[in-house]
UniProtKB/Swiss-Prot annotation:
Protein name: Glutathione-regulated potassium-efflux system protein KefB
NCBIfam families named among the record's database cross-references: 2a37, PRK03659.1
Assembly description: Interacts with the regulatory subunit KefG.
Membrane topology, as annotated: Multi-pass membrane protein
A GO molecular function held by the record: glutathione-regulated potassium exporter activity
Gene: kefB
Amino acid sequence: MEGSDFLLAGVLFLFAAVAAVPLASRLGIGAVLGYLLAGIAIGPWGLGFISDVDEILHFSELGVVFLMFIIGLELNPSKLWQLRRSIFGVGAAQVLLSAALLAGLLMLTDFAWQAAVVGGIGLAMSSTAMALQLMREKGMNRSESGQLGFSVLLFQDLAVIPALALVPLLAGSADEHFDWMKIGMKVLAFVGMLIGGRYLLRPVFRFIAASGVREVFTAATLLLVLGSALFMDALGLSMALGTFIAGVLLAESEYRHELETAIDPFKGLLLGLFFISVGMSLNLGVLYTHLLWVVISVVVLVAVKILVLYLLARLYGVRSSERMQFAGVLSQGGEFAFVLFSTASSQRLFQGDQMALLLVTVTVTLSMMTTPLLMKLVDKWLSRQFNGPEEEDEKPWVNDDKPQVIVVGFGRFGQVIGRLLMANKMRITVLERDISAVNLMRKYGYKVYYGDATQVDLLRSAGAEAAESIVITCNEPEDTMKLVEICQQHFPHLHILARARGRVEAHELLQAGVTQFSRETFSSALELGRKTLVTLGMHPHQAQRAQLHFRRLDMRMLRELIPMHADTVQISRAREARRELEEIFQREMQQERRQLDGWDEFE
């Protein structure tokens, strides 16, 4: 592509994403499917704006690369070791069983056995990008099914290496392609990367961080990710696996969160580009001429993978309510199939079967498009199962009256609130997206609804029209603000109370008219500060008064700075306000010191 062509392609990608994704979200089909449809629209079989799909698809794999780096940052080596059973047990079983079944079905359609084996392995793989994105959207990261799904995806990435090595063997050209000296050098280079990364990365980032220039730190992070990907690609290995290893090596470093912050914006954009590129690669000509064959193929592929995954989840001991989530999210074909089929085609494994190869490729792409829809069906099934009428023995002491309070989110923050309310005999209903948490809470008598709390129908089913208050404890600030807007629009009678992760979220809540909120660490930090004052010799009564004064004045400053909380030009005004409030605090505390102590020295 010429430079101007790349610029035009970039503009088209951005326009397609901006137009299609909000529309898809509004229709309730999800952002991933929106990206895929946008790709179909601008690709060679749609409006034809872009024709060089293969080059863009290869570039867009960087989205998966960045995603795997961030996942690596979240997994330290000890955590990875804990997952070894699920990675090499369930992961290996899924690939082998799915590949065997699918290869057998391909042989029934007159594929040569060598081509059928390659086809079965390629189809057994799932889309890392799509599965991880959907798991995050569905809140599966913390659940047992999400952990198991990640283990299977990681094994599939590891299986890329032997799968590619198998192709020349099946093509009968092993002697030409297997230079054992080269293979040995690649293994040594890979080991060298592991050792070098283990002992060099932290000192290098410590040196860069010492410069104090944030842009250089971001550039170094990009260099690490892209360099790892390029190095692994040169070795003929998975780029995503290389960046995942780099992430794991830095997972226990002090720079973990800064690295994640630097990479996150690039990850989102490039993942979107990847899904658009997959949509562009869909050959609608083959779909039109072989519609029935393609539809049957997609159904068979998805059904076989769901069957294998469901049975493995059952054998592994996954709860019945989570098995369909696990099976559904990994039911599609993956991007690795395109790479494997291309390699096999260059080795003439599919000679005489080019149309069949095209049909299989179209099947993989369409199977990706079915996954978001399939997960919506799974969500509806889970909603009916968990949000329908409950049996009496499932809820020992929760009565059938309408709730007084709805608690959204039941993580560590929400659990404390829920327990306090339940201890005081308040009628509460909990909305939670983590199905394993739903199962656990029902055992303890909580009235729980599974699903996304930003859905008006779910709020209505949970009793929002009759409840007095709603307590929002979402992890993501965006979800909190969206839920506040929905409640103000559809349930204006509700008293809204919310969790704020910090001052920025507190400002946003105040601007939205929510005055009852709690900053996540503010109260506990104040309490620890009070105890610190006591250990430094301040009388407990004065320390308590100092804590109360500080809380009141900090809240006053928070309200005064609302109009300028996002205005960098007026940061100096914020500093002046802080100094003024500190002076007021000092004067009031001097007045306090003149007063007699109000109670004894013991807490």
